[in-house]
Every structure is written in C-alpha cells, then in structure tokens.
C-alpha cells in the first residue's frame, strides 16, 4: 500500500509528516523549515505558497492569510478578477505540502490524513475534505487535532492507563479534549472549543495597542493604511514570540507613515506584563471550554494525569500559567507544540495501512445533532461527545392534516431554539399519503462516519419511501465544482512546474556563463585564439538569450555552449597530458647522461683500528 502522509493544515502554519518504520518523521520544506506558513500569494498570474508568499505580504495586497477561519462558509477571495473559495486556497497549501512530501519520498503521493480542530462542524470538515480532493489527495481520514496530539504523545505509553487533557491553542482555533489512554485504546471522553480564538487574536490586541499609541502621539490612524497594517501585523507576531522568552521587546517601524513635517516612525517598548494585560480577556476565554470539557467528561482535576499543550500560542507564558492554575498540574513539555499534531496524523495513516498495530482510536462528535420541530425548537438526536462512528433514529409525524411532504431541517449546536444553531442542510420527503396529523410515521436517521461527516435519512414507514442525503450546506461545493477546481489545480500545478523548470534553467545557464568566463581567464595563453573566439561567441549568445523570454532558445544556446566548453576542456586536457609526458621524458634523459666518478677506497681491518 502506498504511503499515507499526515498533514496538520493550520491557520498560520502547516506541517507534513510521514511514518518511517514505526516513527513519524516531519518533512522539511525546500527552504529547510519543518513548518510552512499557510499563506498564498498571487502575482502576475503566478501562485506562491509558504515562506516566499509571507515575505512579500507587505507589498502585495493579493496575499491570503488565515483562510482556515473561513472554511465551511460562503466567503470568497477576489483576486485579479477571479473568485477563490476557502477550499481552493487551502488546496494550494495542501498541494505545496504534497509536493514537499513527493520530493522527499521520491514517489507520487495521493493519500493523506488531515487534521482539523475538534470543534469544527460538519460544513468545516466537509470543506477540508474537498480541499484535499482539489489538491489531488484522497483524504483517508479527517482526525481531530487534540486526538492526533494524544496519539503522538501516547503511542509509546500503551502499557499504562492515563487520562490526558490536550489544550490546543493554534493560530486561529482553540480546542480542549480529554482522552483516556490504555492498552492501545485512545478514547476521547469529551471535547470543547472556540473556532474563533487563536494566535491571530493575540496579534490583534498588540496591533490595536500600537495603532492607539501611534494615533495618540502623532494624530494618524494607521488602521486605515493597508501596507502599514501588514507591517504592524508582522511586528506584532514577532513581539508576541519575543515576549515568550524575554520580559520586554522593542517594536521599531521606521517610515511607517508621513505627516505634515515629514516621515513618521513607530517606536514602542512593549513589556510582557503589558501584553498579558492586553490579552487577559483572550486567555480567560480559553478557560470556559476547558471547564466544560472537564464537566462533560465527569472528571475532577485530580483525575487528570497529564496536560499536553499543543499549538504555537501555548508558548505564551500567561497561557501556560492559566492552564496550570486551572488544572492544578504542571504542563507536559515533552512534545513539540508545532509538530505533534502532524505526527499524530502520520501515525493514524500508519494505523490505516497496517504499519501501526494494536491501536484503536475512539473519537467523538463535538456538537449535538438534531432537526427542527414544531415551534422552531431543536430536537436533539445525537448528543455532543458521542463516540463516532454512530447512528441514531427517531420517529416523527406530520403537524397538519393531509400534509403531503416533510421538510427536514438538519441542525448542529447546543441551543434549544433552531434559529440559534448551525444549519447543516435541508431536504424534503415528499408524496406522503393524505392522513390526519400525527398519523404518518416518519423515521429520521442520523449517521456520523469516522470523519465526523453527517448523513441523514428520512423514511415514510407507511410507504417505505426514503430520502437520503449527505449533508450539503450552502457553503459546500458540488461534485461539478470540485471537478472543475481539481482541473484548475492540475493546470496550475503544471504551470508552476514549468515556471520552476524555467527558473532552474535560467540559473543553470547563468552559472554556466560564469564558469566559462572563469575557465577562459584561468587558461589564459594555454588556449588557441580560434577556440577562445568560438567559446566567447557561444557565451555571448547565451547571455543574449537570457535577456529574452524564449525558453527553447536559452536551452539550445546553453547546450551549444556546453558542447564547446566540453571540447575545449578535452583539448586542454590533452595539451596538459602531452606537456607532462614531455617533462617526464626530459627528466629520464637527464638521468641517463649523469657521470660516474671513480673513487679509491682502502679496506680498514679491525686490527688497524686498535
């Protein structure tokens, strides 16, 4: 069975892994980094992903960041006259990670396990799966991030029973899950979270503070300047990271704006205590879901054996202190918060292929599922924190006499009123025979698969007529849309490949020109004028071709110069060999002509010595 890669598709950074033997390995990207920024940039028809896209975000307004926050919505990004869905942007990031894995493994990769926040709803999970398909990946499993982290943490600890709390604060989402580990079984007891809380929000409080300070000092509102805002965002992110290790940091942004008297510079000294004051409300927001997860699991603090911190934002000292205070236990420092989720995804891939044995993963649905009933209320069929996969049926009836159809409004959430919950979709069961209200028997069945994706069936028990759908919310993509996006992605991948090949060719040609110039200089008078002239002409022809856009011309001129330089090198080699032979012959002649002088010698006897 082909390799299944593990991917942590993060809000700010992503990571790709593969199982080697029984150990998950993080694959470095071409820049040598173990994580890749989840950033996509568009410039002159070219798509850039990762570090190169992030670096030019200040000057390029067509840069997309934190797209994960819009998964499962009808949000679109309009760039250069074209609209992109969150699934398409995410697919570009996934495709980049796929290419990284293929370069490392030296083989085609088409299967992956992708992680999502535990609190992702059905629409967000389906959008992630669609993104994988667009990127040319068969998504073998969608796995919750805290569960993946626990899998990576507990794989070598199957000999003991533990209850583990995973506190996952990433770039844009927050989850907390409680798991029971023992005998190779990883059972999720409860999960809670907030999909609109993460590192981006911590950056934002710093940005807001800097904007307010600058306005107070200079009377200029930087929030209205897009380029200034991007510089502030980069500076805020760096300051946040710095304050995890030092007690204060200097934020210096020269020429951030201009006033009546010339350029204006931003200089602010930010202390850790000030940052903690600014972010206090965000940290307190993480405690609500933490308490909820503990309550749902029916556990007290003394029941928790380990607290695992996941996500880059858990490096913030105030976050660590808040978790320690809430749970009353030191946090485990033995896992890398940026990589552990992707490593767990690779392990899950190994479970699927059979490379990892005796591991059973029992996850849960994070939110309750139900349908709207009379009075606009939500009737719950499957409670949150139910182990998946699962199925549940319930019988409903009509609300009025001779009702010909039933509208099934599928909901996900915890509020009592339907309008306050997330609509997953709607469908109708039609052709119900005329009858008094309350007489028809309509059986509604909810199925949740191992990926947490919902299927709903409505069946008229009187006629056995059935209507079955996989939930398609307003933000979901149709099969036709996905197919079109897959083709677009393939075309873009081919175009990107051509661009990479062109860049490589130009670099090779440029390097060849330099080498030829150096070789001609080094050889000096050891090369004939005719040969030198030929090499110079071919070299100049290649330099001229490099100034143009004709790739085939560059390729042919490069080959011509390579041929000339090879012939030249062969000639020089022969000349050097001949010179060495002549030198050796001359040395041999000198040895033969050497004169031998006669010398008298006298034998000395031992008696003469005395």
From Swiss-Prot:
The keyword tRNA processing does not apply. Induction: By stress conditions e.g. heat shock. InterPro entries: ATPase_NBD (IPR043129), Chaperone_DnaK (IPR012725), Heat_shock_70_CS (IPR018181), HSP70_C_sf (IPR029048), HSP70_peptide-bd_sf (IPR029047), Hsp_70_fam (IPR013126). The keyword Translocase does not apply. The modification Phosphothreonine is found at residue 173. Residues 579-610 are annotated as: Disordered. Keywords: ATP-binding, Chaperone, Nucleotide-binding, Phosphoprotein, Stress response. It comes from the Bacteria. Residues 579-592 have a biased composition (Low complexity). It holds the Pfam family HSP70. GO terms for molecular function: ATP binding; ATP-dependent protein folding chaperone; unfolded protein binding. Residues 599-610 have a biased composition (Basic and acidic residues). Acts as a chaperone. Belongs to the heat shock protein 70 family. PANTHER family: HEAT SHOCK PROTEIN 70KDA. This is Chaperone protein DnaK. The gene is dnaK.
């Amino acid at each position: 069975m082909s390799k299944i890669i593990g991917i942590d598709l993060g809000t700010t950074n992503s990571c790709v892994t593969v199982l080697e033997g029984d150990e998950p390995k993080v694959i470095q990207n071409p820049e040598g980094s173990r994580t890749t920024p989840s950033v996509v940039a568009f410039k002159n028809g070219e798509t850039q992903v990762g570090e190169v896209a992030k670096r030019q975000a200040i000057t390029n307004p067509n840069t997309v960041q934190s797209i994960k926050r819009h998964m499962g919505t009808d949000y679109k990004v309009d760039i250069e006259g074209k609209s992109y869905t969150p699934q398409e942007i995410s697919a570009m990031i996934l495709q980049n990670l796929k290419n990284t894995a293929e370069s490392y493994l030296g083989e085609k990769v088409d299967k992956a396990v992708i992680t999502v926040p535990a609190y992702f709803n059905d629409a967000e999970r389906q959008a992630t799966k669609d993104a994988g398909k667009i990127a040319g990946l068969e998504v073998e499993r969608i796995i919750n991030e805290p569960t993946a982290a626990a899998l990576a943490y507990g794989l070598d600890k199957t000999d003991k029973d533990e209850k583990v709390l995973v506190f996952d604060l990433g770039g844009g989402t927050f989850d907390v899950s409680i798991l029971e580990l023992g005998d190779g079984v990883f059972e999720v007891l409860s999960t809670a979270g907030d999909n609109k809380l993460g590192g981006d929000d911590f950056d934002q409080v710093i940005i807001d503070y800097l904007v307010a300070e600058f306005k107070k000092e200079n009377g200029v509102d930087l929030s209205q300047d897009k380029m200034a805002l991007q510089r502030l965002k980069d500076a805020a992110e760096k300051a946040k990271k710095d304050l995890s290790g030092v007690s204060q940091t200097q934020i210096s942004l020269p020429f951030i704006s201009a006033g009546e008297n010339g350029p204006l510079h931003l200089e602010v000294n930010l202390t850790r205590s000030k940052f903690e004051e600014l972010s206090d409300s965000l940290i307190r927001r993480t405690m609500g879901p933490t308490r909820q997860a503990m309550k749902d699991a029916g556990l007290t603090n003394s029941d928790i054996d380990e607290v695992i911190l996941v996500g880059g934002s858990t490096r913030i000292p105030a976050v660590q202190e808040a978790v320690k205070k809430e749970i009353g236990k030191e946090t485990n420092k033995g896992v890398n918060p940026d990589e552990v989720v992707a490593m767990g995804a690779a392990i899950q891939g190994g479970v699927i292929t059979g490379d990892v044995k005796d591991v059973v993963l029992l996850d849960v649905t994070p939110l309750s599922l139900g349908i709207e009933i009379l009075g606009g209320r939500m009737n719950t069929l499957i409670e949150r924190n139910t182990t998946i996969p699962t199925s549940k049926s319930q019988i409903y009836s009509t609300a009025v006499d001779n009702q010909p159809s039933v509208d099934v409004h599928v909901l996900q959430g915890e509020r009592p009123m339907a309008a306050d919950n997330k609509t997953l979709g709607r469908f109708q069961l039609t052709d119900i025979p005329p009858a008094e209200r309350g007489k028809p028997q309509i059986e509604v069945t909810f199925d949740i698969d191992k990926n947490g994706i919902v299927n709903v069936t409505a069946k008229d028990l009187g006629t056995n007529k059935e209507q079955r759908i996989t939930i398609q919310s307003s933000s979901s993509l149709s099969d036709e849309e996905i197919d079109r996006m897959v083709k677009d992605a393939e075309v873009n991948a081919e175009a990107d490949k051509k661009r990479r090949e062109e860049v490589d060719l130009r670099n090779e040609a440029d390097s060849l020109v330099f080498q030829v110039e150096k070789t001609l200089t080094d050889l000096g008078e050891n090369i004939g004028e005719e040969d030198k002239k030929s090499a110079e002409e071919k070299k100049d022809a290649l330099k001229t071709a490099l100034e143009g856009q004709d790739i085939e011309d560059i390729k042919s001129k490069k080959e011509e110069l390579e041929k000339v330089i090879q012939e030249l090198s062969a000639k020089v080699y022969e000349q050097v060999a001949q010179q060495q032979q002549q030198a050796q012959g001359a040395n041999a002649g000198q040895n033969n002509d050497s004169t031998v002088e006669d010398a008298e010698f006298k034998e000395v006897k031992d008696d003469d010595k005395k």
